[in-house]
Amino acid sequence: MYEENSLVGKILNERYEILEVVGSGGMATVYKAECKLLNRYVAVKVLKDSLRYDLDLKEKFNKEAQAAAKLSHNNIVSIFDVGEIEGLNYIVMEYIDGITLKNIYVIISL
């Protein structure tokens, strides 16, 4: 079992060093990480621990990765990897640094 911040500082799958929490939703937490093999930043989406035994949700999570991996467009992040290790289901994708959609909404609302 893990808590969101407990992955920070850990290395996932001997490859992705988890640096910080980027955001969290009902299903998953997204982290900024560094891929040690390719020396680049990536985003790692990890299925919440409380959902790890929900087989339907795990299947949905994996299908999300497969569907997104088939897409190629400048406005869609690329999927680099997907997997499960020690009960953690994860998707590794392109990391985009910048302002979030939530922040844009707050600015526009002012």
Language model: regions and residue ranges:
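Flexible N-lobe loop architecture of eukaryotic-like protein kinase catalytic domains
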Residues: G23, K63, S72-N75, L88, ...
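Conserved N-lobe loop of protein kinases adjacent to the ATP-binding glycine-rich P-loop
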Residues: E34-Y41
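Protein kinase glycine-rich loop
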Residues: I18-G25, V30
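Conserved short submotifs of the Hanks-type protein kinase catalytic core
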Residues: E86-T100, I104
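Activation segment of protein kinase catalytic domains, centered on the conserved DFG
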Residues: V106-L110
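A short, low-complexity linker immediately N-terminal to eukaryotic Hanks-type protein kinase catalytic domains
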Residues: Y2-I18
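Activation-segment/catalytic-loop signature of the eukaryotic protein kinase fold
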Residues: V82
